[in-house]
From Swiss-Prot:
This is tRNA N6-adenosine threonylcarbamoyltransferase. Required for the formation of a threonylcarbamoyl group on adenosine at position 37 (t(6)A37) in tRNAs that read codons beginning with adenine. Is a component of the KEOPS complex that is probably involved in the transfer of the threonylcarbamoyl moiety of threonylcarbamoyl-AMP (TC-AMP) to the N6 group of A37. Kae1 likely plays a direct catalytic role in this reaction, but requires other protein(s) of the complex to fulfill this activity. Keywords: Acyltransferase, Cytoplasm, Iron, Metal-binding, Transferase, tRNA processing. The gene is kae1. Binds 1 Fe(2+) ion per subunit. The keyword Metal-binding applies. Its EC number is 2.3.1.234. HAMAP family: Kae1 (MF_01446). Substrate binds at Y127, V128, S129, G130, A131, D159, G172, E176, N255. It is an enzyme of class 2 (transferase). Fe cation binds at H106, H110, Y127, D283. It catalyses: L-threonylcarbamoyladenylate + adenosine(37) in tRNA = N(6)-L-threonylcarbamoyladenosine(37) in tRNA + AMP + H(+).
Length: 323
């Protein structure tokens, strides 16, 4: 169908964000992230935060004055209480404005906003966020997962190690800063099994190392190890698929060291590396709205009564008719 703009709401975990997006640009956006006082994300507390602030951020984008042809929301994967909160808001908006409703896969949204912002066409995607570490590529109508973590996602691993060091959430950016000051590599477990990888053993070893070595050196070693594993499986996916583009997405993708390692690998293989602008790495309403725009164009809408959230929604469950 013909459509020009969609309002999207993101709220899978700590980020709460809304945006109105068209084919050409982001027309309006607002956010109000949940920041825990201590520790990591508490699902019920995050959901309470989202419930308290979702009307505020939606009102901010509505006050921009731009109309929209549909409403999209993050259907999953994510924290159930948070997903249900934003889904309720999206249903209410769709009914109030009498427009179609689209339930968006959060992982697919990271891919699509990256493709939109960089202009790449058919890349191997390294998707690295809190709970996810996946190597993905399009094949036979879907984004197929070629490899992934067998235990903990890279973002959660970094955040947990950050808390072990006494760093405030989120730990990833603070570990990146400390790693730039590190000079000595400390041996840590390196676990790649075919196309899959594992971080739990490496994290345990890093915690033990933190009691013996400078935290800057441990952060440096942790990053080098963890990112080398990701680059290895991404390079293997490039060889297997024969593609010549690599796109990075997800919050951890903003790490400049990881981007540098991927860019070097791509140059060595004659491939091109793509990274979207920094604002699109973290969870954001714009990626939900843009993917909702694609789904609306291809009639992937859902009735309100069938719009239940899915906390374990897999990337490869989604049909992709636009590629």
């Amino acid at each position: 169908m013909q459509c020009s703009r969609v309002l999207g709401i993101e709220g899978t975990a700590w980020s709460l964000s809304a945006a109105i997006v068209g084919w050409d640009k982001v027309y309006a956006e607002a956010s109000h992230p949940y920041v825990p006082e201590t520790g990591g994300i508490h699902p019920m507390a995050a959901a309470q935060h989202h419930a308290s602030h979702v009307s505020q951020i939606v009102r901010q984008v509505l006050d921009s004055g731009y109309d929209f042809d549909g409403v999209a929301f993050s259907r999953g994967p994510g924290l159930g209480p948070c997903l249900r909160t934003v889904a309720t808001a999206a249903r209410a908006l769709a009914l109030a404005y009498d427009v179609p409703l689209m339930g968006v896969n959060h992982c697919v949204a990271h891919i699509e906003v990256g493709r939109w912002q960089t202009g790449c066409h058919d890349p191997v995607v390294l998707y690295v966020s809190g709970a996810n570490s996946q190597v993905i590529a399009f094949r036979r109508g879907r984004y197929r997962v070629f490899g992934e973590t067998l235990d903990i996602g890279i973002g959660n691993a970094l955040d947990k190690f950050g808390r072990h060091l006494g760093l405030q959430h989120p730990g990833g950016p603070k570990i990146e800063a400390l790693a730039r000051e590190g000079k000595n590599y400390i041996h840590l477990p390196y676990v790649v099994k075919g196309m899959d990888l594992s971080y739990s053993g490496m994290m345990s070893a890093a915690k033990e190392a933190a009691a013996k070595y400078l935290k800057e050196d441990v952060c440096f070693s942790l990053q080098e190890n963890a990112f080398a594993m990701l680059v290895e499986v991404t390079e293997r996916a490039l060889a297997h698929t024969g593609k010549n583009e690599v796109l990075i997405g997800g919050g951890v993708g903003a790490n400049m060291r990881l981007q540098s390692m991927l860019d070097t690998m791509c140059r060595d293989r004659g491939a091109k590396f793509y990274a979207p602008p920094r604002k699109f790495f973290g969870d954001n309403g714009s990626m939900i709205a843009y993917t909702g725009l694609l789904q609306l164009k291809y009639d992937q809408t859902i009735p309100v009564e069938d719009s239940a959230v899915n906390p374990i929604y897999r990337t490869d469950e989604v049909e992709i008719p636009w590629l």
